[in-house]
UniProtKB/Swiss-Prot annotation:
The keyword Transport applies. Signal peptide: none annotated. It catalyses: a ubiquinone + n Na(+)(in) + NADH + H(+) = a ubiquinol + n Na(+)(out) + NAD(+). NQR complex catalyzes the reduction of ubiquinone-1 to ubiquinol by two successive reactions, coupled with the transport of Na(+) ions from the cytoplasm to the periplasm. NqrA to NqrE are probably involved in the second step, the conversion of ubisemiquinone to ubiquinol. Belongs to the NqrA family. GO terms for biological process: sodium ion transport. Composed of six subunits; NqrA, NqrB, NqrC, NqrD, NqrE and NqrF. This is Na(+)-translocating NADH-quinone reductase subunit A. The lineage of its organism: Bacteria, Pseudomonadati, Pseudomonadota, Gammaproteobacteria, Pasteurellales. InterPro entries: NqrA (IPR008703), NQRA_2nd (IPR056148), NqrA_C_domain (IPR022615), NQRA_N (IPR056147). PANTHER family: NA(+)-TRANSLOCATING NADH-QUINONE REDUCTASE SUBUNIT A. Its EC number is 7.2.1.1. Keywords: Ion transport, NAD, Sodium, Sodium transport, Translocase, Transport, Ubiquinone. One of its GO terms (molecular function) is oxidoreductase activity, acting on NAD(P)H, quinone or similar compound as acceptor.
């Protein structure tokens, strides 16, 4: 058992009921291009094309053989692009049930798969994109070999679903997926789960099971990798979430891609917070219809700490998102708010009365202050359990000193690993974009 002591479980209202319900009907789905770091698409479809589920929509020019497939059958209604023609989203109006099938194996054959067979099926189906590398959080190259693979079967994000509830419906598919991943390479396959959970395992020669406990970020893959198999400039690992392991198991046993998702629909502005069954890339306006309290709301694909605002061409459930979080837009100004006792405000420091309360808070998007310089008062050290010096690292990220940032461990991190630092920052700094800029520069220049 690895126990995390530093961190923060955000006391946010609107926690979901841990029972799975059917969500609203999905009429539109999309793939979001900007989720795939460094990807340059070569489009294989046009607006108006009719596509089958599993059909290739685009391929990565930088990574030949890595394809991105349709999560549903229907008609391509929009290919949205932003500045410099960056791909924002490929939108499909869901129609029919036609799909492309892939190679199918029985239970005995799974244990004898070769690495080449696993790669071929994952890459041709588009499920290879479930894997991400650390460092850089990119889809791995088609011929890359990791030091190890991490399966994340726990979630400590605010308002998250309990993976054990989701996995109960798919025990066999999950263990089949683990078997397939164990055949992908000869290194270790690390299954990380909560210490008090009852997650199924299977007897595999290279499978190692690890228990974690403690506050968020105990459930992040970056935390698991840091304590078990740290990365460097010359060493990489891959990671994926438990629902993608289910999808991999189903792909190899049925020959069909599985795009169902169970996500938590939760937050202070959700009328009935609960777990809902929906589809990868679902339109979040449709999914949240008649589910939200009145007023101006911010719908987030992912966690309230590190998710993406679902608006315009990005109004869809992300490829790696297991949550839909909803908070109110905090546009109101509070007169002399800095001098008030703040019994309805939360802070990690003892500056408001809410710090001493055990109640849940209706957080909004308001940052309660303007941008200012970093103030090293020990807030970052309280929420970062990794063996790094957060204040110095964040200073280097803010100043663009990538050499020092690399020496201090930035290659181990992803945006979600610094989300708590952003939340507790007295200077209202956004450290995720700073980290991404540093990682891009390091990858390009070394």
């Amino acid at each position: 058992m690895i126990t995390i002591k530093k961190g923060l479980d955000l006391p946010i209202a609107g926690k979901p009921e841990q029972v799975i319900h059917n969500g609203n009907a999905v009429k539109e789905v999309a793939l979001l291009g900007e989720e795939y770091v460094g990807m340059r698409p070569s489009m294989k479809v046009r607006e108006g094309d009719v596509v089958k589920k599993g059909q290739v929509l685009f391929e990565d020019k930088k990574n030949p053989g890595i394809v991105f497939t349709a999560p549903a059958s229907g008609t391509v209604t929009a290919i949205n692009r932003g500045a410099k023609r960056v791909l924002q989203s490929v939108v499909i109006k869901v129609e029919g049930n036609e799909q492309i099938t892939f190679t199918q194996y029985n239970e005995d054959e799974l244990k004898k798969l070769t690495s080449e067979q696993v790669r071929q099926n994952l890459q041709s189906s588009g499920l290879w994109t479930a894997l991400r590398t650390r460092p850089f959080s990119k889809v791995p190259a088609s011929d890359a070999v990791p030091s190890s693979i991490f399966v994340n079967a726990m979630d400590t994000n605010p308002l998250s679903a309990n993976p054990e509830i989701v996995l109960k419906e798919h025990w066999q598919d999950f263990t089949d997926g683990l078997t397939v991943l164990s055949r992908l390479h000869e290194g270790k396959l690390h299954l990380c789960k909560a210490g008090d959970s009852n997650i199924p395992t299977i007897d595999l020669p290279n499978l190692a099971v690890h228990d974690f406990s403690g506050p968020h970020p105990a459930g992040l893959s970056g935390t698991h990798i840091h304590f078990i198999d740290p990365v460097s400039a010359t060493k990489s690992v891959w990671y994926l979430n438990y629902q993608d392991v289910i999808a991999i198991g189903k792909l190899f046993t049925t020959g069909e891609i599985y795009t169902d998702r169970v996500v938590s629909l939760a937050g202070p502005q959700v009328k009935n917070p609960r777990l809902i069954r929906t589809q990868l890339g679902a339109n979040l306006s449709h999914l949240t219809e008649n589910e939200l309290s009145a007023g101006e709301n911010r719908v987030i694909s992912g966690s309230v700490l590190s998710g993406n605002t679902a608006i315009g061409p990005y109004n869809y459930l992300g490829r790696y998102a297991l949550q839909v979080s909803v908070i109110a837009e905090g546009r109101e100004k509070e007169f002399l708010g800095w001098i008030m006792p703040g019994k309805n405000k939360f802070s990690i420091t003892r500056t408001v009365l809410g710090h001493f309360s055990s109640k849940l808070f209706n957080f909004t998007s308001a940052v309660n202050g303007g941008h200012r310089a970093m103030v090293p008062i020990g807030a970052y050290e309280r929420v970062v359990p990794l063996d790094i010096i957060p204040t110095l690292l964040l200073r280097d990220l803010a100043s663009g000193d990538t050499d020092s940032a690399q020496a201090l461990g930035c290659l181990e991190l992803d945006e979600e690993d610094l989300a708590l630092c952003t939340f507790v920052c007295p200077g209202k700094n956004e450290y995720g974009p700073m980290l991404r800029a540093a990682l891009d520069k390091i990858e390009k220049e070394g």
